[in-house]
Amino acid sequence: MRDADDRRAALWQGRMAERAAILALRLKRYAILERGYRIHGGEIDIIARRGDTIAFVEVKARPTMDGALQSITPQKRRRICRAARVWLASHPYAAAMTLRGDAVFVAPWRWPHHVAAAVELDFG
């Protein structure tokens, strides 16, 4: 029972972090194209566009901002790239745009911290 409660709490925390990240991105004039984009073997929390840039955004909720960037593991980066490749294949207009892997870090009682180009995209 405790494990189920912990999973529910983590899921709720993740949803709230994504909502905060979306608000922060919208205030920076990003248009949200997708939220919770998932494929087999990959996922992207938010896909956003501003001007000629498409940002594949990973959202991380942490108790503090310390070490938040390190929480994006090489395995997570591969999953983001895999999902981005599939998304790009179904959105050919995006091929001519600048593609970037961003992150938004969310901590309690702090404004979300958006880091552009925090995730190295490797489409090779």
UniProtKB/Swiss-Prot annotation:
GO molecular function per UniProt: nucleic acid binding
Domain of life: Bacteria
Pfam families: UPF0102
NCBIfam families in the cross-refs: PRK12497.1-5
Family membership noted in the UniProt record: Belongs to the UPF0102 family.
Name recorded for this polypeptide: UPF0102 protein Msil_0293
